[in-house]
Amino acid sequence: MRKIIVGSRKSKLALTQTNWFIDQLKALGLPYEFEVKEIVTKGDVILDVTLSKVGGKGLFVKEIEHALLTKEIDMAVHSMKDMPAVLPEGLMIGCTPKRVDPRDAFISKSGASYKELAEGAILGTSSLRRSAQLLAARPDLQVKWIRGNIDTRLRKLKEEDYDAIILATAGLQRMGWDNEVITEHLDETLCVPAVGQGALAIECREDDKDLLQLLAHINDAVTEKTVAAERVFLHKLEGGCQVPIAGYATITENDAIELTALVGSMDGSVLLKETVVGTDPEKVGLEAADRLIKQGAKELILAANKGQQ
């Protein structure tokens, strides 16, 4: 019986996601056993600055990918939104399980909704994507950066001077906390989700054919297709955490992919947005990127990157 070593970050959410996925594999009843290896990533250690200032995408995966390449682990369970657009040679996303709720969750101290927040209220987020879109709709709000895992951020909301914070609904759902803490879900038209938000990425070595066959049982074709379009868009624009960038795709009634893509200025004063419909994930992602580039997306990205230096 083969033992599969599964790499995971140490946070409660990461381990919850990893153990959930292992349970899906165990339920297949095939002759494998599983062991979780906890790995500390750079993003877990550096908590005193915003994600955009310490390298953006890849912060939560590089050490885990190193363990995959050196064969310390056989596969890793990541949040898809943490994945860089390009993976190291020899590694691949071997499986995308069914996506859960991709929306952002608004959590306020008083129970007030986003629209009801008092003028000048303090909103906690570590995401340029969230802050740009929410400032575009409510320029009167003050954004204050907040870092840490889910439990830390919820504690900071209670104890510090934040009036509200924004978290991914998916993480709260996976922890079983969504019903008790979420004030409201932010509609995708108000705040377009991050590329891959709500989806998991199961990363493994390209040459591990045995494991890839096992993972194929859990793969969700719709999630794979929609996330692929989002990630092609992200790759074309070379956008990481250093710029407000968003992309969310769904499948239409006619089985086409509909991708809404967005790039914004840091302060939310400019939001470029396009919706593209097509059948091929790569073509849809590239088309969305090209349309935004024509609107001036590259200039916004350059300006954002200069602002981070």
UniProtKB/Swiss-Prot annotation:
Keywords: Porphyrin biosynthesis, Transferase. Coiled coil: none annotated. The modification S-(dipyrrolylmethanemethyl)cysteine is found at C241. One of its GO terms (biological process) is protoporphyrinogen IX biosynthetic process. CDD domains: PBP2_EcHMBS_like. It catalyses: 4 porphobilinogen + H2O = hydroxymethylbilane + 4 NH4(+). It holds the Pfam family Porphobil_deam. It comes from the Bacteria. It is an enzyme of class 2 (transferase). Transmembrane segments: none annotated. GO terms for cellular component: cytoplasm. Binds 1 dipyrromethane group covalently. Its cofactor is dipyrromethane. Pathway: Porphyrin-containing compound metabolism; protoporphyrin-IX biosynthesis; coproporphyrinogen-III from 5-aminolevulinate: step 2/4. Its EC number is 2.5.1.61. GO terms for molecular function: hydroxymethylbilane synthase activity. Tetrapolymerization of the monopyrrole PBG into the hydroxymethylbilane pre-uroporphyrinogen in several discrete steps. The porphobilinogen subunits are added to the dipyrromethane group. Monomer. Belongs to the HMBS family. PANTHER family: PORPHOBILINOGEN DEAMINASE (PTHR11557:SF0). This is Porphobilinogen deaminase. The gene is hemC.
